[in-house]
């Protein structure tokens, strides 16, 4: 089963009949329109390419416009691809949120919020050094970042200050709380990566 592309609306909570509060993220999943079907013979692998939403005509490039016209669909806000295993799709076909009706858990992929350049304490959860006791300059610095003349360098991958966030993140095995096909909404338990209105990819959980 393939996934779908949606948009993070925000978080809220819903209550069970017993009165238990469940924190949920609301994901709006408009119809995903098939723009291309890739086959083993033509492309070397099987996949389906989809688009969703809409884009102003003035913002669509000529190559993109031709691609959408060939598929017979309205220009969307992007193109995404899902690998397929035996499923049959046709150009212009619409795939809706109700495909998750019988799915218990999903994996959600998005782009995390960008935090800019951050230090080791915020970026890697390093402990801070002494506030006093002889320390007057190095409260939030990393400390030692290497050894001695051997190896005489800082190892690759050393956790240091740098750019935090704005990277692809996947949260696995989030419970599907509700599927509202009429309003095109999917409610999942817990938080998903990204800012409000950012695009997210929802797939059936690989570890479910």
UniProtKB/Swiss-Prot annotation:
Q: Which residues get modified to N5-methylglutamine?
A: 149
Superkingdom field: Bacteria
Q: Name one GO molecular function term.
A: rRNA binding
What keywords are assigned to this protein? Answer: Methylation, Ribonucleoprotein, Ribosomal protein, RNA-binding, rRNA-binding
Describe how it is modified after translation.
Answer: Methylated by PrmB.
Quaternary structure annotation from Swiss-Prot or TrEMBL: Part of the 50S ribosomal subunit. Forms a cluster with proteins L14 and L19.
Q: Which GO terms describe its biological process?
A: translation
Instruction: Choose one Gene Ontology CC annotation of this protein and give it.
Output: cytosolic large ribosomal subunit
Tell me which NCBIfam families the record gives.
L3_bact (TIGR03625)
Name of the featured protein: Large ribosomal subunit protein uL3
- Report the SUPFAM superfamilies cross-referenced here: Translation proteins
- InterPro entries xrefs: Ribosomal_uL3, Ribosomal_uL3_bac/org-type, Ribosomal_uL3_CS, Transl_B-barrel_sf
- The protein's gene is named rplC
Briefly state the protein's biological role: One of the primary rRNA binding proteins, it binds directly near the 3'-end of the 23S rRNA, where it nucleates assembly of the 50S subunit.
Family per record: Belongs to the universal ribosomal protein uL3 family.
One short Pfam name that applies is Ribosomal_L3
């Amino acid at each position: 089963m393939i996934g779908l592309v949606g948009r993070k609306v925000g978080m809220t909570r819903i209550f069970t009949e017993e009165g238990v509060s469940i924190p949920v993220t609301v994901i709006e999943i408009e119809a995903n329109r098939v723009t291309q079907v890739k086959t083993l013979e033509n492309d070397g692998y099987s996949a389906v390419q989809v688009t969703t939403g809409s884009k102003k005509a003035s913002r669509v490039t000529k190559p993109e416009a031709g691609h959408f016209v060939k598929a017979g669909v309205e220009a969307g806000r992007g193109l995404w691809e899902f690998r397929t295993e035996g499923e049959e799709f046709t150009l212009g076909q619409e795939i809706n949120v109700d495909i998750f009706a019988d799915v218990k858990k999903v994996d959600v992929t998005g782009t995390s919020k960008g935090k800019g350049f951050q230090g080791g304490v915020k970026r890697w959860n390093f402990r801070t050094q002494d506030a006093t006791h002889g320390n007057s300059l190095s409260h939030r610095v990393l400390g030692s970042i290497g050894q001695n003349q051997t190896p005489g360098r800082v190892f690759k991958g050393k956790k240091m200050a740098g750019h935090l966030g704005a990277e692809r993140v996947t949260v696995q095995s989030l419970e599907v709380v509700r599927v509202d096909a009429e309003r095109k909404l999917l409610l999942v338990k817990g938080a998903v990566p990204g800012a409000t209105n950012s695009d997210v990819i929802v797939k059936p959980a690989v570890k479910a």
